[in-house]
Amino acid sequence: MLLMAVDIGNTNVVIGFIDDGRIAGTYRITTKANHTSDEYGLMITQFLALSGYKPADVDDVIISSVVPKVMHSFRASIVKFLDIDPMIVGPGIKTGLNIRMDNPQNMGADCIADCAGAYYEYGGPILVADFGTATTFNYVTADASVISGLITTGIRTAAAALWEGTAQLPEVEITRPKSILAKSTKPAMQAGLYYNFLGGIERTIAQFHKEIDEDFRVVATGGLSRVFADGTNMIDIYDPDLIFKGMWHIYDRNVR
């Protein structure tokens, strides 16, 4: 059974092909609101070919989106090119999670899929950290209850404000520096961004430990998760495909 999973985020659209639970290929493109459904359809066809599949091989599609305009174009492309009406992660979809928030309907589809992936792959209690355009932390208990969500600025968003808001600071790659003892502008920016953000991550995790009276693991996912997971012993699991695993489990719960 071949499931195409689509994660539409503010910065990137990531497409994953899941073959009987195995992630067979993932592809990342820039999120652009002005892409037409035909453009998305051509991309889907190309990505399928790169993974060794044809459009007719796709049995179903599931979409997680936080960008409604792009989601509508993508959905239209899937209907046209694959002749499939995709499942959308949102209200009415069974996840197996109990979202114990003040406004559960406002929880992002990406966060829901992340939490499902973390819980069904690794069990609870678990803290899910997603390093995307925004950085989110969501806590899932042993009985699959999502009891807390934290949202803050993503590292790329913060970094862009640094070089876009100053006249002479250049754009730099977000990477783990060799040393905090920087001796020129670019290394100084890289070290400053990295250690400032890493410190915020560790302080946030520490506060969860302080306020929650149980042991839990921390799983990191998202575009820059590897950079920070390698720099701290407070992150237990690195899983770049967590959202796709979550969408696979959500899909399975709704069709079986």
Swiss-Prot record:
Subunit structure: Homodimer.
GO BP terms: coenzyme A biosynthetic process
Organism of provenance: Bifidobacterium adolescentis (strain ATCC 15703 / DSM 20083 / NCTC 11814 / E194a)
InterPro entries, alphabetized: ATPase_NBD, Type_III_PanK
Pathway: Cofactor biosynthesis; coenzyme A biosynthesis; CoA from (R)-pantothenate: step 1/5
Catalytic reaction(s) noted: (R)-pantothenate + ATP = (R)-4'-phosphopantothenate + ADP + H(+)
Binding site for ATP: D7, I8, G9, N10, T11, N12, V13, V14, T133
Organism lineage string: Bacteria, Bacillati, Actinomycetota, Actinomycetes, Bifidobacteriales
Stated name of the protein: Type III pantothenate kinase
Subcellular location(s) of the protein: Cytoplasm
Binding site for K(+): D130
Annotated cofactor note: A monovalent cation. Ammonium or potassium.
Similarity annotation: Belongs to the type III pantothenate kinase family.
Gene Ontology CC entries for this record: cytoplasm
Record-level Gene Ontology MF annotations: ATP binding; metal ion binding; pantothenate kinase activity
Residue positions binding substrate: G108, A109, D110, C111, T185
Catalytic residue positions: D110 (proton acceptor)
Cofactor: NH4(+); K(+)
EC code(s) of this entry: 2.7.1.33
Predominant subcellular localization, coarse grouping: cytoplasm
